[in-house]
Amino acid sequence: MPMTLGYWDIRGLAHAIRLFLEYTDSSYEEKRYTMGDAPDYDQSQWLNEKFKLGLDFPNLPYLIDGSHKITQSNAILRYLGRKHNLCGETEEERIRVDILENQLMDNRMVLARLCYNADFEKLKPGYLEQLPGMMRLYSEFLGKRPWFAGDKITFVDFIAYDVLERNQVFEAKCLDAFPNLKDFIARFEGLKKISDYMKTSRFLPRPMFTKMATWGSN
């Protein structure tokens, strides 16, 4: 029986999960919910089902895999990572995965808060000012490794790809000073399962955010 991934019909928090499901050749189907237009941003498609799915903490995204019903995007990725043994093999690798997972989510939320803020244009220069320092830390952490944990890909590379590429869309030149990060993105997109998925109609790189966002809603 295929897994079910539920989320809005946007990139959002599901991008890394979708990429991981494709990379692992998982059997899954998507339940994509559509939000209404301004000014009401009707969410009834989701709200009508929210408390009927048996989720402990009803939210989007969710993954249903048989009796396992999971919310929180990173919990979903960790579950899938364990299922496919892609969480790091040594203690050092697992520590690197844990650190980067949380660091990436911090940075993801900073960008999301900016893009949903009504004062986006006023706040954008401040974000761009600190972006090179943020990217430098990722570049130093990756070093000469092919993947962030080491020689083998882990679930955190899927989050890293999402966050780095999202920032690259936001500011096209933000990775120009960090060739190892650009190489990482090219390496990730060059994975056969990923490149094949990117050519399908299921691939959803945009919109980045919901219709309520000031930037990235189309």
Curated annotation (Swiss-Prot):
Catalytic activity: RX + glutathione = an S-substituted glutathione + a halide anion + H(+)
GST N-terminal domain mapped to chain residues: 1-88
Family per similarity comment: Belongs to the GST superfamily. Mu family.
Chief place where the protein resides: cytoplasm
Subunit structure comment from the entry: Homodimer.
One Gene Ontology molecular-function label: fatty acid binding
Enzyme class: transferase
Keyword Coiled coil in annotation: no
Residues annotated to bind substrate: Y116
Compartment annotation: Cytoplasm
Keywords from the named record: Cytoplasm, Transferase
Task performed by this protein: Conjugation of reduced glutathione to a wide number of exogenous and endogenous hydrophobic electrophiles.
GO cellular component: cytosol; sarcoplasmic reticulum
Residue positions binding glutathione: Y7, W8, W46, L47, N48, E49, K50, N59, L60, Q72, S73
Keyword hit for Plastid: no
Domain GST C-terminal: 90-208
Gene Ontology biological process: cellular detoxification of nitrogen compound; cellular response to caffeine; glutathione metabolic process; hepoxilin biosynthetic process; linoleic acid metabolic process; nitrobenzene metabolic process; regulation of cardiac muscle contraction by regulation of the release of sequestered calcium ion; regulation of skeletal muscle contraction by regulation of release of sequestered calcium ion
Listed EC numbers: 2.5.1.18
Top-rank taxon, per record: Eukaryota
Protein known as: Glutathione S-transferase Mu 7
